[in-house]
Amino acid sequence: MIISYLQVFYLKIINISLKGFFYIALTVFTTVSSNLIANNDPSKPIKPPHYRGLCVLNDSCAWFSGSKGTVIRTTDGGKHFDTISPQSTNTRFAYFLPDGKQTVENYNPVSDAPISLWRKDYRDIWAKNEKEAVIMSAGDSALILKTMDGGKNWTIVYTDFRKDIFLDALEIDSKTGIGMVLGDPINTRKHFAALYTTDFGSSWNNLPIGDWNLPLDSLESFFAASGTSLVIIEIKVKAADSCVNCLARTKNLTVGFAGGGINPSYHIVKFKQQTRHTKKQNKRFNLSISQPRVVSNLIIPMPIAGGPGSGVYGMCLSDDGRMIAVGGNYTLPDSFNGASAHSTATNFGLKWSGGIGFQGHTGGYRSGVCISRPIFSEQLQSHPTPARVQTGIHKPNDTTINSLIKSGNRITFCTGTNGSDISSDNGVTWYSIPKQTLTSGLYFEGSFNACAYSSKHLWMVGNSGKFQRIPISDLLSMRIK
């Protein structure tokens, strides 16, 4: 399928064959030239997928995933899109033999049909490059799959068929391959589901159970609305002092995560894993890998409103160590009290401000949040700057984002099902962004599930196949209120 350059479009699944192949049609707001495949039964229209997983690699390449087993990739900044979803014909199972080596076998569409690859809701996705990516399903059993060839083939690297398993977030460090998956408490054990990887998601193991993943109250769990309830704070890999060039390593992983509960809290947990050489009788060395252990576990109260369905839905970490969290209650999308919080210094979330009664709230429920790199004067000078607005809850309607920015500021953007907001002061004050036509002619749709920045663009995905990619130059010119 060949389509012209587009920024906003709806991906609609039109038909699914017996083997689960996806046929895609695109309905776009901008000019499109494509061959649309008709629905065989117009009386039963097939709804487009909802996208919640988003991984942006650069200004050209991004992966996103969602319901109906859908995985999409662009490698040219949105000019064209590849539908690379796992199917019964391109998916294999990965197994580990007693000697620790991994082997695979083909997926059987008959015996393995209960897995229903094409029905999974892939709520989070991580990609290392244009070829290598990992996807995570949420709800109704758990699957983690990996591709090494840009989605042509997939390998199932983790399964859990317990009815009460629900995975929420996936994070992997692109340099070391160390990562983690976080899930809701499992009824049979009452602990958070937690997995780790050290090989870029090719294999996964359970993290040790302890106080660190025991829910603080009866409501504490996490939300898979954007895959951003988990962040990697720091990773350190140190070689053994006596063996600088060998494989013996000490690996330290520090993560932060937050969700819902009676009183939502932010967890900072540090894990340590050691890899040692053990001497054998023939004077050779064996590689012994220990299970990660918890070195420290901090629990920090958050000024986010709690209760059923309420809490932190998304977080982001800036390059200077500031944390920003958004949330609310998805059943009450217009309720803004306690829907956002920010860390008060570059301390990775050791102290938080905001929440109930704080004037710098978002416009309601928000599930995704992201923060840009610093914006410098040369970018600002290319846009006219109206009179600077006053901070606080009452804001004029005739100003642009550019009027808020000083050289060196970062632009924080958050979005949800009922709108989007922006901040120039690391989440202290938020401004609503109405739907509007941008200076480039693009139309800003307004509401999404997840967002992420590349160096020159803001990317967003949402319900009903919604996607948008906006140049930061357009972002600076957007009207706010």
Where do the language-model regions lie?
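N-terminal secretory signal peptides that target proteins for export/translocation
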Residues: 1-16
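Cleavable N-terminal signal peptides
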Residues: 26, 36-37
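Residue-level hotspots at or immediately adjacent to binding/recognition sites across diverse folds
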Residues: 37-481
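N-terminal leader/targeting signatures
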Residues: 5, 17-18, 25, 281
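Bacterial N-terminal signal peptides
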Residues: 21-31
